[in-house]
Amino acid sequence: MPMETTTETKQSGDLIFRSKLPDIYIPKHLPLHSYCFENISEFSSRPCLINGANDQIYTYAEVELTCRKVAVGLNKLGIQQKDTIMILLPNSPEFVFAFMGASYLGAISTMANPLFTPAEVVKQAKASSAKIIITQSCFVGKVKDYASENDVKVICIDSAPEGCLHFSELTQSDEHEIPEVKIQPDDVVALPYSSGTTGLPKGVMLTHKGLVTSVAQQVDGENANLYMHSEDVLMCVLPLFHIYSLNSILLCGLRVGAAILIMQKFDIAPFLELIQKYKVSIGPFVPPIVLAIAKSPIVDSYDLSSVRTVMSGAAPLGKELEDAVRTKFPNAKLGQGYGMTEAGPVLAMCLAFAKEPFDIKSGACGTVVRNAEMKIVDPDTGCSLPRNQPGEICIRGDQIMKGYLNDPEATTRTIDKEGWLHTGDIGFIDEDDELFIVDRLKELIKYKGFQVAPAEIEALLLNHPNISDAAVVPMKDEQAGEVPVAFVVRSNGSAITEDEVKDFISKQVIFYKRVKRVFFVETVPKSPSGKILRKDLRARLAAGVPN
């Protein structure tokens, strides 16, 4: 067993938990790209990106060179320090080149799901003030009008329709022409959108210092919490527009010199084939993928013995599912991490993944990352709680977000005066420093790891002339974890049906935000201040009497 450090301290009455691993030196002064490529001379000729779609392999030297060329290309199109580009792409090498290229300029990348509806994409492009959108030709229709009306350039990674540029125009630049920029540690580099603990999606400002710290907390140090090395092959099937994949797969992989195997979307047979073919050693997944592996009859036909780490995040993984999937990966350590976009995103990581591993319990989602502090507080009083008592999980450290873009009020609600980020998740820390999540204070629905903000769907429902009031809450689902369901009050005399409500929503939102059930009610329960009492509605669902 590795050496442990003191994990519990008292500060001004607060009980504060720290990692069992000692703090490490983190080069927080480095821009993100410099940090990720800091040790490139040790593995410049090794594979960096493997494109699962066509087996094309890019070495570290080729990737770093292409990122610098793209930086110059973006600059020639007018992108300067602190400008924003939107990456509207599925997993692809170009996603990596665009994100890292923007970092070299001190520019910001906002990442959006290419399956968003046109309205959802445009909303994010507007809110983030994106000056360039990098996408595929099949998604151009979603942004075409907005781009032409707002002088936003659209770049396609495949055949470019009229009025769009081709990505090759970026990669043909002279890499030596990168403008000299002085990037400050607190400058924003990534702008993912998250609903936070309540409300509508907001831009989460993640800085160079924040992402460098978060990656270092996972993979740096003598005894790295998430042990990876240059011989590893990481499966990148989770979407890079999601911070879990961007941080714990791409950035961590680049830092250690591992090969990153890019897969556009999850499909069980090709997924298993790629693991076998490229001898994937690290599998960062989400519960729906774990469920598919546990239940698929074809898994036993493939050799998965190369996998040594199976990590699940983005939503809690049940103990039964954890046990079921263990049998499919004979040589793998299986465990969970816990993250939240605003926290950079990793708060806790399973110590079975450490270079010198610790024993862990099934169902735990790790222990707090090093160089950070965690406390559990009573949601009503704000007082910190001792071990084994559930309360709101709070985290403090250099890895957390700078704040929400143009939303100081939401920032103040999430990060308090002492620098603690309040997650809105309820959990407890046991006598072995392991964190268990038990409930969610926040309103967010997690569909297969994707965020659904009830307020967003409720606003759309209230636009319907035959609906006078509505509330959206999560309903448990074996496949998806949670699905959104709506409680709807019909307008006077209206006979609107469940199917009509579902169709009305499905035309306006991406698939995972679609309402799966509609329950018609006389009234939506509310507090005296008018806040929807979601707990009451969730209790009705649990009791099997929604109406």
Curated annotation (Swiss-Prot):
GO terms for biological process: phenylpropanoid metabolic process. InterPro entries: AMP-bd_C, AMP-bd_C_sf, AMP-binding_CS, AMP-dep_synth/lig_dom, ANL_N_sf. Its EC number is 6.2.1.12. Residues 267-336 are annotated as: SBD1. It holds the Pfam family AMP-binding_C. Residues 337-404 are annotated as: SBD2. Pathway: Phytoalexin biosynthesis; 3,4',5-trihydroxystilbene biosynthesis; 3,4',5-trihydroxystilbene from trans-4-coumarate: step 1/2. Disulfide bonds: none annotated. ATP binds at residues 194-198, 202, 336-337, 341, 425, 440, 531. Its cofactor is Mg(2+). The keyword Nucleus does not apply. It catalyses: (E)-4-coumarate + ATP + CoA = (E)-4-coumaroyl-CoA + AMP + diphosphate; (E)-4-coumarate + ATP + H(+) = (E)-4-coumaroyl-AMP + diphosphate; (E)-4-coumaroyl-AMP + CoA = (E)-4-coumaroyl-CoA + AMP + H(+). Gene3D superfamilies: 3.30.300.30, N-terminal domain of ligase-like. It comes from the Eukaryota. (E)-4-coumaroyl-AMP binds at residues 244, 248, 314, 336-337, 341, 349, 442, 446. Coiled coil: none annotated. CoA binds at residues 265, 448-449. GO terms for molecular function: 4-coumarate-CoA ligase activity; ATP binding; CoA-ligase activity. Keywords: ATP-binding, Ligase, Magnesium, Nucleotide-binding, Phenylpropanoid metabolism. Belongs to the ATP-dependent AMP-binding enzyme family. Carboxylate--CoA ligase that may use 4-coumarate as substrate. Follows a two-step reaction mechanism, wherein the carboxylate substrate first undergoes adenylation by ATP, followed by a thioesterification in the presence of CoA to yield the final CoA thioester. Both substrate-binding domains (SBD1 and SBD2) are involved in the substrate recognition, and are sufficient to confer the substrate specificity. This is 4-coumarate--CoA ligase 1. It comes from Nicotiana tabacum (Common tobacco). The lineage of its organism: Eukaryota, Viridiplantae, Streptophyta, Embryophyta, Tracheophyta.
